[in-house]
């Protein structure tokens, strides 16, 4: 084997572990303010770190103490002011310690309060025999509630990505640049306290509301709503709730 080919193979093999590790690196969400209502009736407030993969809260109180709160001990909580770092810059281009946090602009109205509820969850294992308390963000009113779980994942930016052709092509070979990807899972919270996974949101929502399915599709078309977008789907589920309530009131 000639020397250039050996060098190329060696370079590729050294980069593969880095790329693979970057695919599944989950990172917590940070919020500037929160109000957490515990199952014992107490209420705590402060900045909050949400570890979605662990269903765990870290709340920094006004006196600087940090409370670790598992989902089992939480009745409900609300957060506002999601904090992000400059996650589209590689470490060598800024001083992380001195760089002030900024509000995440991925979603509109970052400062609004975002309520969370706790439901028993089987982690989407169809044949699971047990569940555990887990956090779900509430996106609409009810009685059928649209729920969301978000996961922030650190991924490596491909070298071929056009976002990096200006100013960042000088980074050393083998040093990947990371960015934050947002994964979103949607569910329905039923009035009975269970949840329904929306693996294919349009199909599953229409299946849950069979009597209203035709009207829901018409409503979505009229208002240009996408069943796969959380904010859009919240409007559709609210409309489904109103249709059911109208039907119940006439019976």
What function would you assign to each model-found segment?
Residues 1-6:
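Positively charged n-region of N-terminal signal peptides that target proteins for export
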Residues 8-17:
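Bacterial N-terminal signal peptides
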Residues 33-39:
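A short beta-strand micro-motif
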Residues 45-48:
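Short beta-strand-centered aromatic/proline hotspots
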Residues 50-199:
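Aromatic-patch recognition
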Residues 197-251:
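Long, compositionally biased interface segments
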């Amino acid at each position: 084997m000639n020397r250039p080919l050996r060098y190329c193979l060696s370079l590729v093999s050294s980069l593969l572990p880095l790329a693979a590790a970057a695919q599944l690196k989950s990172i917590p969400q940070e919020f500037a303010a929160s109000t957490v209502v515990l199952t014992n009736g107490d209420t705590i407030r402060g900045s909050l770190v949400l570890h979605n993969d662990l269903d765990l809260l870290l709340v920094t109180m006004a006196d600087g103490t940090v409370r670790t709160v598992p989902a089992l001990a939480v009745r409900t909580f609300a957060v506002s002011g999601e904090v992000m770092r400059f996650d589209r810059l590689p470490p060598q281009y800024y001083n992380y310690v001195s760089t002030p946090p900024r509000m995440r602009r991925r979603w509109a109205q970052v400062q609004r309060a975002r309520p969370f509820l706790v439901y028993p969850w089987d982690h989407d294992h169809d044949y699971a025999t047990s569940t555990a308390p887990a956090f779900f963000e509430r996106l609409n009113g009810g009685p059928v509630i649209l729920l969301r779980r978000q996961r922030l994942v650190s991924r490596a930016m491909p070298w071929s990505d056009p976002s990096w052709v200006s100013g960042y092509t000088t980074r050393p070979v083998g040093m990947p640049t990371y960015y934050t990807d947002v994964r979103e899972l949607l569910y329905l919270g039923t009035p009975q306290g269970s949840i329904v996974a929306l693996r294919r949101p349009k199909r599953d929502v229409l299946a849950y509301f069979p009597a209203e399915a035709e009207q829901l599709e018409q409503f979505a078309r009229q208002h240009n709503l996408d069943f796969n977008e959380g904010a859009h789907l919240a409007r559709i589920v609210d409309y489904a709730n109103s249709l059911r309530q109208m039907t119940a009131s006439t019976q």
